[in-house]
């Protein structure tokens, strides 16, 4: 979690957020897992906000006319102050940057174009110095001390863009042609060696563990990693929605192309009192040694059809949703057909 940057949700730009932990409708996803639906707000006039703290700063600006609206947001975060309070002392240099933009242009009475963009650049550098941790009980206290050499340097870059062309033939129908691209580049590198001592502590008269009774274990370890991930995803979708009385019919077709380049080279060596662990007596082995080279290109096709019926009663509103989703993945030649149905109830008191 030390490398964790900014969430995709920018509170200054988002109008509504929907989340489902599973069992969602056919219009979302090919797997019955969680889904996050973010709706960006449309500024009604010129607006802006600025905030700053010891952990970072944010700024956003929006502007709107009859045909054109724009919304921009910039965020910067650094959690070095929080990380410096951990048991492992050292130089923490994290920096997380995020820029998002949302543009809409209504070039005809029934046509609208929109563009969503996101740039996220996260850097994390850590040079550990030492770690001193005490644990155990009042009668059996231990102390674990480590001195470090080396550092860790990570970089995570994400670029995302989506263009949508919307057509409104009447007030009940909407068509949308969308294309999006996602690119990520992740690099994790570290070489950190540590020399550690595990000591037994004796209790003083006031009950505090201060006196060192002797070393229980002495050793060293070395962690190494050169991991890189490059992935790009390009998707094109055609979607539609129509309201027929109390029913809302939705459908969609999507083609998605994926390209992944993954390299993993990671190992850890441990030496305790002059013996490499695990000790076999015949060879020097690592605690673990990971090596992987993966290159993958694939195509995905998906389609869905969904109907939502709303029934209002004296007690509240019932929402019945049923649909069918079909998907094909070229990587494993697998076709999945997923029927989905759900019933929800909103009490009348909550509607008001």
Residue ranges and their predicted role:
Residues 79, 90, 112-168, 183-208, ...:
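Flexible loop and strand-edge segments within Gram-negative outer membrane beta-barrel domains
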Residues 1-19:
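Short acidic/polar hinge/loop motifs at secondary-structure boundaries
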Residues 31, 67-84, 96, 131, ...:
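Surface-exposed extracellular loop regions of Gram-negative outer-membrane beta-barrel proteins
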Residues 209-213, 219, 223-318:
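Outer-membrane beta-barrel transmembrane domain signature of Gram-negative proteins
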Residues 50-54, 72-78, 115-121, 177-183, ...:
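Transmembrane beta-barrel strands of outer-membrane/channel proteins
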Residues 14, 43, 55, 65-68, ...:
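Outer-membrane beta-barrel channels and translocator barrels
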Residues 55-76, 89-127, 152-181:
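Transmembrane beta-barrel wall of Gram-negative outer-membrane proteins
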Residues 55-57, 77-81, 120-125, 156-157, ...:
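Structural signature of outer-membrane beta-barrel domains
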């Amino acid at each position: 979690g030390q490398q964790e940057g900014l969430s995709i949700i920018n509170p200054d730009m988002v109008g509504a957020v929907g989340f489902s932990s599973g069992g969602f409708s056919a219009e979302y996803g090919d797997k019955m897992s969680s889904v996050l639906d973010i709706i960006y707000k449309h500024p009604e006039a010129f607006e802006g906000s600025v905030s700053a703290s010891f952990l970072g700063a944010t700024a956003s600006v929006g502007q709107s006319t009859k045909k054109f609206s724009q919304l921009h947001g910039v965020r910067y975060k650094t959690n070095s102050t929080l990380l410096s309070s951990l048991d492992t002392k050292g130089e923490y240099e994290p920096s997380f940057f995020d820029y998002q933009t949302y543009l809409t242009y209504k070039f005809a009475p029934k046509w609208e174009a929109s563009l969503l963009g996101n740039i996220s650049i996260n850097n994390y550098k850590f040079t550990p110095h030492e770690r001193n941790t005490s644990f155990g009980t009042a009668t059996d206290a231990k102390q674990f001390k480590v001195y470090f050499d080396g550092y860790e340097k990570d970089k995570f870059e994400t670029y995302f863009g989506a263009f949508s062309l919307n057509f409104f033939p009447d007030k009940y129908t909407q068509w949308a042609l969308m294309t999006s691209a996602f690119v990520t580049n992740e690099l994790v590198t570290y070489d950190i060696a540590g020399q550690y001592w595990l000591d037994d502590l004796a209790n003083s008269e006031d009950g505090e563990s201060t006196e060192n009774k002797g070393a229980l274990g002495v050793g060293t370890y070395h962690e190494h990693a050169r991991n890189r991930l490059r992935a790009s995803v390009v998707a094109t979708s055609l979607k539609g929605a129509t309201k027929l009385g109390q029913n809302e019919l939705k459908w969609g077709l999507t083609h998605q192309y994926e390209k992944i380049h993954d390299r993993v080279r990671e190992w850890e060596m441990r030496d305790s009192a002059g013996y490499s662990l695990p000790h076999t007596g015949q060879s020097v082995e690592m605690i673990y040694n990971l090596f992987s080279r993966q290159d993958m290109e694939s195509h995905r096709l998906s389609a869905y059809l969904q109907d939502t019926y709303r029934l209002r009663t004296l007690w509240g509103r019932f929402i019945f949703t049923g649909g069918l989703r079909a998907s094909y993945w070229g990587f494993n030649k697998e076709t999945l057909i997923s029927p989905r149905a759900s019933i929800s109830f909103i009490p009348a008191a909550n509607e008001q």
